[in-house]
């Protein structure tokens, strides 16, 4: 019999109340004193990047290294979650995992980031002239760092395995507080430290989800306005976010086996169709050549890329920002992965999260971003002219506009972006509700509460000023400071979690 512990899940009204209160105070400050709001966010962002950026870089590399080592351990083949067979078939499992993270980068960043690095090459590499052939592989390789092995590994390998062990085999809550157990034992999980862990994790993923809802909602609105030839004004932006909110709320309320699963499958199918078209209609040979070259560059330079500290201003705008974003997502994403991975082994989870998903994401970036790079190489100015002034939203439309059947392709990308955002919205609504309710099956009213709160927050920030969503994305990095400390015990706790019971 597995060892159990008397820490029963409960309705954690205190965590819900404090988290919601802090969100309200955040919005009140935004509404009352915009100057003070901006100053506090900017100052906190700079402080977090300066004092924790180096730590995050080391932690991200260490987390991936420990995951690769844990993969080889004898206990890694043991089924987790108190099930002998997986709850979800392989395709559905992979679809839900991929769609939840790719919301932020699946379309927008895959198109824009490689071009940004082509125009302004990353300082970690030996000097390459902007827009040169050498800069192409380096641009993709830098994108691979930000969306590849290290990013995926922190989102659900070690932490998810620990939560599955502690929740399903030891009786601890399926909540961020349980990640404290390898360090503090029962006392830290049950006391104020546990409440604090849940609150900061809730705020981090709240900011990390509202950011993409608002930011990508603006990109969809911009794309629609260009598509139909009208002005991109506030009512269109708010209407776009309201539609996104309606989709992910419907999905989240319908449950894990219905809405979330169906939306993820639809997302994957449409994504594969779009990728196939881009690969065949775009610069196919260019994509294949530079995917291979960029992957080899990334593997050869991975330690240098991960630990580069030569340009702190560049790091805070790119690598440290992404690391803060993904670390902030870590505990809540781990809850989601733990819930959908019952009946899977630690080895399966690590392989998917730390190897397979990163490679699929790199291929995704190579096809979407590589198409833009190839179009630019063949006809200089095709992509960089619309991108001038760091106009990131214009890159995707420039790519689709240069392809055959551009009207259909543009519309498909806008729908795909909406589906990605909705998939992350429903998944994180579910995770927040799990923490708030203390049960794997949170009530519908609680899912509605968190889903509505995220959507309304995005609308308020957009209505208030052009930079509101941008400030929220900076706040993501601030919340990652305490969350990163919460994830550290996973580096050694995973070995206890995968240890066979007989040992």
What are these regions (language model features)?
Residues 188-196, 200-344, 351, 356-410:
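Membrane-embedded translocation segments of transport machinery
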Residues 2-7, 39-45, 72-90, 115-140, ...:
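Flexible loop linkers connecting adjacent transmembrane helices
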Residues 22, 55-73, 271-282, 360-370, ...:
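Hydrophobic alpha-helical segments of multi-pass membrane transport proteins
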Residues 11-18, 76-95, 285, 289, ...:
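C-terminal membrane-solvent junction of multi-pass transporters and transport-like membrane proteins
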Residues 2-10, 34-48, 67-87, 138-147, ...:
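Membrane-water interface regions at transmembrane-helix termini and the short interhelical loops
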Residues 6-31, 64-66, 103-106, 146-218, ...:
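Helix-loop-helix module between adjacent transmembrane segments
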Residues 14-21, 47-63, 94, 136-168, ...:
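Extracellular loop-to-transmembrane helix junctions
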Residues 2-135, 276, 490-501:
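N-terminal alpha-helical transmembrane segments of multi-pass membrane transport
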